[in-house]
UniProtKB/Swiss-Prot annotation:
InterPro entries: BamC (IPR014524), BamC_C (IPR042268), NlpB/DapX (IPR010653). It is a lipid-anchor. It holds the Pfam family Lipoprotein_18. A lipid is attached at C35 (S-diacylglycerol cysteine). One of its GO terms (cellular component) is cell outer membrane. It comes from the Bacteria. Part of the Bam complex, which is composed of the outer membrane protein BamA, and four lipoproteins BamB, BamC, BamD and BamE. This is Outer membrane protein assembly factor BamC. GO terms for biological process: Gram-negative-bacterium-type cell outer membrane assembly; protein insertion into membrane. Belongs to the BamC family. Residues 1-34 form the signal peptide. HAMAP family: OM_assembly_BamC.
Length: 359
C-alpha cells in the first residue's frame, strides 16, 4: 500500500509541476508579447530617475552669529517652474526636418508647412509631374488634383512607425509654385490625428509633415539620378567621329571627345571591329593591334560596312587635340590608310564607340 501511495503521490506531483510549468510558460509568452507591442522604450530616456524626487530650492539659513558673503546675482539659482513632460513621459526623439536631398535645394519648416526650394532650371522643368508620380508611387491616395495651379490634396495617409504605440493619420496639401528664380515645393499639413483624435502637438505635426516631404523628395532624387544616368549613357554612346587630315595632309579620324575618354574606350571599341590590342602606350598615344576582318553577319550586327582592310598587324596613333582627339591607322606596311579607307572607318568607329564602354 505504501509503495502504491508513493507512486501515486509522485505522479500527482509531476502533473502539478507540469501544469505549473505550462502556466509559467504561457504567462512568459504573454509578458513578452505585451512588451514587444509597447514601443515607449524607443521614445523614453533610460537611466536613474531619482532627480524627479529631488527637493525644491529653499532659502539659505545661516546659524546665529555667522555673517554670509554679500549676495552676488551671478551665482544665484533662479527659482522657476517647468512645464512639459518629464521622466518617462518625455519624448527624447530628435525633431524631424525636411532633408535637402535634391541637387541645389534648400529646405525650411514653418508652422505646419515644409518647403523645398529648387533652382528653376531645365532639370526641374517637369517638377510638378514628377511630384504627382512620387505621390502615386508611394501609394498616397490623391483626393483632389489641380494641374493648372499645380496643387493636390491627399486623402488620409496611414503612417506606420515602429516607435509609436498607436499610428498617426494625416492629410496634406502639396503644391509647386514659382518664387522669383526658384521653384517652391511645399507640403502643408491639413489634419493630423491619432486614434481618431486631432493632434495639435507642433512636434508631431513637424515629424509627420517632414516624413511626407522626405518621402516625396527621395523619389524625386531617384528620378534625377536615373535621368542623369540616362544622359551619361547617351553621352557615352554619342561620340561623334569625322574624317579629317593631319598637318601633312594624311587622312585621320577626328573624334569629338577628350583624349582620356577616347583612350579608355578604344580597346573595347577596337575589339568590336575585329582589332585585338597587343601593345599600348598611353603617354605616347600608340597602340598595336592585330586585325582579323569580321564576317558579314558581324558587320551587320555592328551596323557598319566592311572598310576593306587586309588582315595583319596595324599601328594606331592617338592625338590629343584638347577637347577632341585624332586617330591615325597605319597598315602592316607602315602606310597611312587611303582616303577611301579612312572615310570607311568613320562609320565603323562611330558604330564601335556607340556599342562600347570604357575598359
Amino acid at each position: 500500500m505504501a509503495s502504491l501511495f508513493d507512486k501515486n503521490s509522485f505522479q500527482m506531483t509531476r502533473l502539478q509541476k507540469t501544469a505549473v510549468a505550462k502556466v509559467v510558460g504561457v504567462s512568459l509568452i504573454m509578458l513578452l508579447a505585451a512588451c514587444s507591442s509597447d514601443q515607449r522604450y524607443k521614445r523614453q530616456v533610460s537611466g536613474d530617475e531619482a532627480y524627479l524626487d529631488a527637493s525644491g530650492l529653499h532659502e539659505l539659513k545661516a546659524p546665529v552669529g555667522m555673517i554670509l558673503p554679500v549676495q552676488n546675482g551671478t551665482y544665484e539659482v533662479q527659482a522657476g517652474s517647468m512645464q512639459g513632460a518629464v521622466g518617462k513621459q518625455l519624448d527624447i526623439r530628435p525633431p524631424s526636418q525636411p532633408l535637402a536631398l535634391l541637387s541645389g535645394s534648400q529646405t525650411q519648416f514653418s508652422g505646419n508647412s515644409s518647403t523645398v526650394l529648387l533652382e528653376n532650371t531645365a532639370q526641374n522643368r517637369d517638377l510638378w509631374n514628377n511630384v504627382v508620380k512620387a505621390v502615386e508611387q508611394n501609394n498616397f491616395k490623391i483626393a483632389n488634383r489641380d494641374d493648372a495651379n499645380q496643387t493636390l490634396t491627399t486623402d488620409f495617409v496611414d503612417w506606420n512607425r515602429a516607435d509609436e504605440d498607436f499610428q498617426y493619420q494625416g492629410r496634406y496639401q502639396i503644391s509647386v509654385k514659382q518664387q522669383s528664380y526658384q521653384l517652391a515645393l511645399t507640403v502643408k499639413t491639413l489634419e493630423l490625428k491619432q486614434q481618431d483624435k486631432p493632434v495639435t502637438s507642433s512636434a508631431e505635426i513637424q515629424r509627420y509633415n517632414s516624413q511626407m516631404m522626405n518621402a516625396i523628395t527621395a523619389n524625386l532624387d531617384k528620378v534625377q539620378q536615373d535621368t542623369q544616368a540616362r544622359l551619361d549613357n547617351r553621352r557615352v554612346g554619342e561620340i561623334d567621329v569625322q574624317s579629317g587630315a593631319d598637318d601633312t595632309g594624311l587622312p585621320v579620324l577626328i573624334v569629338r571627345e577628350s583624349y582620356g575618354v577616347v583612350w579608355d574606350r578604344l580597346p573595347n571599341a577596337l575589339t568590336k571591329v575585329g582589332m585585338k590590342v597587343t601593345d599600348s602606350s598611353r603617354p605616347q598615344g600608340t597602340l598595336s593591334v592585330t586585325y582579323k576582318p569580321l564576317n558579314d553577319d558581324a558587320w551587320q550586327t555592328l551596323g557598319a560596312k566592311d572598310p576593306g582592310l587586309t588582315s595583319g598587324d596595324y599601328k594606331l596613333q592617338v592625338g590629343d587635340l584638347d577637347n577632341r582627339s585624332s586617330l591615325q591607322f597605319l597598315d602592316p606596311k607602315g602606310h597611312a590608310l587611303s582616303q577611301s579607307q579612312n572615310d570607311a572607318m568613320v562609320a565603323v568607329m562611330q558604330a564601335a564607340f556607340s556599342q562600347s564602354n570604357a575598359k
